[in-house]
Amino acid sequence: MIAPDATLSDCRLADGVLVINLDHRPERMAQFEKMARPLGLFQGWQRIAAVNGVDIPGYGKPPWFRNGKRDKCWAGRAGCTLSHRKAIEHARDMGWSSVLILEDDIQLGAGFETSARDFLNRTAACADTWGACFLGLSKQVGPSRKLIDLDNARATYEIFGCIGAFAYILKRESFDWILANLPSPESVWTWISRHRAIDRWYARNLSRRCVVHAVSPNLIGHYSSFSDIGQRAGANLVIEDCGSNSHDPLRDCGKTAFVMRCRLLRGRFQLARIANELRGALKRIRGL
């Protein structure tokens, strides 16, 4: 447990902190560096050079591409997926027991330092053995149940899944399984045609392997800037934003209801795999 008089320079959210950043987005890296400099819990962070989707073999060529309007969107999704894979591979190769993976456009929520300290203290005391924890999310997928109240009106929840992979912690036990299920550059277009995006795949599959937690409202959000995935400015997801772009806070459904709803949703997504396979085959014929 962190001593009451300790500073955040005495603690870290994970063994390693990795920031995914495209080479042609240095302004994002500069903004992250400015934000992270005074924060000890980001100390020793490392940059992961993101994969630019338009440079992946097969981009812009049949069968997957036929000069469609959304070609660059699909390239962004593929590059994002391979970038997260690259970060997890790095964490595994470093021998870390946990890794905090951040995208370069993150923004800290109000009362971040207080909530981060409380999160570390209470997570250390939590009996649940979790494998992944999302410090921010864009959209909830499935049920959630409250585990621990944190300072500043936040809480830690167990969740089925969520959309949003801009700030999350993975434990070492999940590394190999995730890497075995994420695509390589050679298979990424087939994978994307079926699963669309890494956060969608996480939302539907990660809780099959490990217990998934999330902090809500967001401990870490992200600011609005041009997205290489969406090819437009994204939503501003920070705790101060109470408008329509802010994610709805998670709600406790109770342990029994949580277990039952997770089983039902898992069965539904298992059936959806057939639809995913068919959609992938169709996109190979028509293009992404």
What do these predicted regions represent?
Residues 1-102, 106-288:
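An acidic/histidine-cluster motif and surrounding catalytic segment
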